[in-house]
From Swiss-Prot:
Pfam families xref list: Anticodon_2, tRNA-synt_1c
Keyword Aminoacyl-tRNA synthetase in annotation: yes
Amino acids binding ATP: K256
Name of the molecule in the record: Glutamate--tRNA ligase
GO BP: any one term: glutamyl-tRNA aminoacylation
Upper lineage: Bacteria, Bacillati, Actinomycetota, Actinomycetes, Mycobacteriales
Domain of life: Bacteria
Amino acid sequence: MKVRVRFCPSPTGTPHVGLIRTALFNWAYARHTGGDFVFRIEDTDAQRDSEESYLALLDALRWLGMDWDEGPEVGGPYAPYRQSQRRDLYLDVIRRLLAAGEAYEAFSTAEEVEARHLAAGRNPKLGYDNFDRDLTEEQRAAFRAEGRQPVVRLRMPDADMTWVDLVRGETTFPVGSVPDFALTRGSGDPLYTLVNPVDDALMKITHVLRGEDLLPSTPRQLALYAALIRIGVTDMTPQFAHLPSVLGEGNKKLSKRDPQSNLFLHRERGFIPEGLLNYLALLGWSIADDRDIFSVQEMVAAFDVADVNSNPARFDQKKADALNAEHIRRLDEAEFVRRLADYFSTHGYDTGLDDARFAEAAALVQTRIVVLGDAWDLLKFLDESSFALDEKSAGKELKDTAVPVLTAALAALKGVGEWTTAQIEDALKVALIDGLELKPRKAFGPVRVAVTGSSISPPLFESLELLGRDRSLERLRAGRDHAAAAVTMDA
């Protein structure tokens, strides 16, 4: 049987890493098995759903390269793929469930259910008590005459609910632990409890991979599936796999309010898809005990949902950053230049370099950054409007001892014939290391800060070449003046 999995988020808020981890596991399993990845939108909550969030979901999947075989903007044999457009299908299933006696109309109010529990000495918060299961037609007619609007409830079986979870193994909910549950509101509108399994059934989903927070809903869905099979809506029940929770700081579940959970904040910092996907894959799965770094293609080749760990996974930002840095280093030079140029363009960063020079600058920082955003911190000295002396770096390097160093550097660089890295390096080494007999750190620290504004920069001689002769000399003079002024102030 061909594997068919689905990713069916609600379009609310911003995509978060736990949600996208679930999408990744579904997508990888489909690609590993040669199956279908179905993307479905659960937009039945008009008050919370938004078109902006829907578009953000499309953006997230496309940015990460998770293509879908069926769904919005792609179509497929089971269209439409937005629940808001499938209402008639759900109403037809409800009618068939009622006609077959698999479901019934329930008129009890929440207050009446609670009162019955109290009268029987039970906990009033136990939930629905199945009271309306066997109402006569006369009783139902009397409730309607009062103006009551019934909900439709499914008859739960009088037996334990057991299934073999692909991640957690055999799982059982004892008989009586799950009451008859509502499939509709009093208005007749179908609820998530109905539409999600019905869509899975109609779309012939074979495997449901989802977060463990949905584990308690599984007995209800198994019961509904059994009813759908009996009335001829489907001929099978999918296999379930409940993926581990993702924890944040302090081992609390990562919530939508945690900055780490916001997928687009990672993109904003400059994560690349390869790095983020690698890390998300590790939130519940591993390719090997002694290996953390792998490509998406390697993940697809190795991924089996049976290998997913049931223990909670903790989001570790430092580890995510380290993996992203490694994937940046693995990009070939031309691809890194393209990614960095796109990132700079998106964020309004402009080095003022032509394409060839920008490629040279990119090569200087590729192995020195964790996220693409770090590259701007290293290269913004090339943009006159963004250049500024870092106060801490200047305080350390542009002191009285820097005045003779920068004076000697200026004199040496004025005499450089061709403004190239090699000639710049030769001139400065002769003047500062041979001439002033300084150690490299003492010699080049003041020059680096004067020219780039910071003690942390790309390689110095290459930076001077990129900046150009005139601007380099101008900044060295300004740096010397800054150091001299500091001497005066100290005096």
